[in-house]
UniProtKB/Swiss-Prot annotation:
GO terms for cellular component: cytoplasm; nucleus. GO terms for biological process: abscisic acid-activated signaling pathway; defense response. The keyword Glycoprotein does not apply. This is Major pollen allergen Que a 1. SUPFAM superfamilies: Bet v1-like.
Length: 50
């Protein structure tokens, strides 16, 4: 099956900074947000660019 979720939120954080944190730097961010649950992360494919 396919799960679809759509949401719209407002934030005082600039869109570019929010995108960078949530998608480009998520491997670093998730370790800081959930240090008790995430020991380490590793990008195994791709370089984040085109």
């Amino acid at each position: 099956g396919v799960f679809t979720h759509e949401s719209q939120e407002t934030s005082v954080i600039a869109p570019a900074r929010l995108f960078k944190a949530l998608f480009l730097d998520s491997d670093n961010l998730i370790q800081k947000v959930l240090p008790q649950a995430i020991k380490s992360t590793e990008i195994i494919e791709g370089n984040g660019g085109p």
